Regions:
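N-terminal cap/lid segment of alpha/beta-hydrolase-fold proteins
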Residues: 1-38
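Acidic catalytic loop of the alpha/beta-hydrolase fold
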Residues: 161, 184-189, 216-217
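Short alpha-helix in the alpha/beta-hydrolase fold that links the catalytic acid
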Residues: 59-60, 142, 166-167, 176, ...
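Short beta-strand/loop motif that positions the catalytic acidic residue
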Residues: 174, 180-182, 186
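Primarily recognizes the serine-hydrolase "nucleophile elbow" in alpha/beta-hydrolase
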Residues: 112-173
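Short beta-strand element of the alpha/beta-hydrolase
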Residues: 40-49
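Alpha/beta-hydrolase active-site loop
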Residues: 94-121
Length: 237
C-alpha cells in the first residue's frame, strides 16, 4: 500500500488516499480513521454502488460516522470500471465493467489485497463489510471466502444482474451476521429478487430492513443506523 496523498484531518477524522497493486491491477483507495488513532485493528470495508466511486457522499458519510462515533477505521476502493480506474473524463459503464467472466474474482482479490495491506497499517482486529447495490454484488462473494469478515451490511441487490450466477453460489457460504436493506419500491432490482437473495444467505443471524421508496432513496437515518449495527459487533471486547 502506497500513500498517494498526505493525511488530511477534518472534524476529527483523518483521510489518506492510497494505491496498491494486485495481479498487475492498480487498486485506488482511501483510508479513514479517527484523528487520535491507535492500532486496535477495527476496520470496515466500504463498497460503493454502480455509477458511484470511493468518494461518493454516502460513502464519506458512513466512513466519518464510523470513525467519529465509534472509533472504527475504514477503507474504500474503486469498483470495476469506476472512479480512478477509469480514464479522466470518462463516465462509468456498468454493463461493460461487469461484462467479463472474471470481474467478480478480480474485485474480490483486490479487496483481499487491500485488507491485507490495511491490517499491516492498522493492526489485526475485527473486520466488517458495508456495501449496497454494486457493493453487495462485490461484498457477498467477498464475505463467502474471507473469514476475517465478522459482520456485514448488504442490500439493494438480488438474484438479478450481471453476476447473479456468482451471487447464487456465494450467498449460502456467507455465515457472518448480516443486516440486509431493501427498498420496497425499488425500480431497478425487483423486490422478489432481493427477498430471494436475503433468503439464500447462509447466516443464521440475519435481519431484513425494508423501507418504502425507490432504489436510491434509502433514508440517511437508516444509513447511520447501519453503522451502529456494524459497531455493535466490532466494538465488543
Amino acid at each position: 500500500m502506497k500513500w498517494t496523498t498526505k493525511p488530511v484531518v477534518s472534524r476529527k477524522v483523518e483521510e489518506t488516499e492510497f494505491e496498491l497493486e494486485c495481479e498487475s491491477r492498480t487498486v485506488p483507495g482511501i483510508m479513514w480513521r479517527p484523528e487520535k488513532h491507535g492500532e486496535n485493528g477495527k476496520l470496515a470495508l466500504l463498497g460503493h454502488g454502480g455509477a458511484h466511486h470511493k468518494r461518493s457522499e454516502y460513502v464519506l458519510a458512513v466512513a466519518r460516522w464510523l470513525a467519529r462515533s465509534h472509533g472504527i477505521a475504514s477503507i474504500a476502493i474503486d469498483g470495476p470500471g469506476h472512479g480512478a480506474r477509469l480514464g479522466e473524463g470518462l463516465e462509468p459503464d456498468f454493463s461493460e465493467a461487469w461484462d467479463a467472466e472474471e470481474t467478480t474474482d478480480n474485485i474480490v482479490a483486490d479487496w483481499r489485497a487491500a485488507l491485507d495491506e490495511a491490517q499491516v497499517k492498522l493492526g489485526v482486529g475485527t473486520v466488517a463489510y458495508w456495501g449496497l447495490s454494486m457493493g453487495t454484488m462485490i461484498g457477498i462473494p467477498l464475505a463467502a471466502v474471507e473469514p476475517r469478515i465478522k459482520v456485514a451490511l448488504f442490500g439493494l441487490m438480488g438474484f438479478w444482474g450481471l453476476n447473479q450466477k456468482q451471487l447464487r453460489t456465494a450467498a449460502p457460504l456467507v455465515t457472518c451476521p448480516v443486516r440486509f436493506l431493501l427498498q420496497w419500491d425499488d425500480e431497478i432490482v425487483p423486490r422478489e429478487r432481493g427477498l430471494m437473495l436475503f433468503d439464500a444467505l447462509g447466516s443464521k443471524d440475519k435481519v431484513l430492513h425494508a423501507h418504502m421508496g425507490l432504489h436510491s432513496a434509502v433514508p440517511m437515518t437508516t444509513m447511520r443506523k447501519s453503522t451502529v449495527y456494524l459497531a455493535s459487533y466490532l466494538c465488543v471486547d
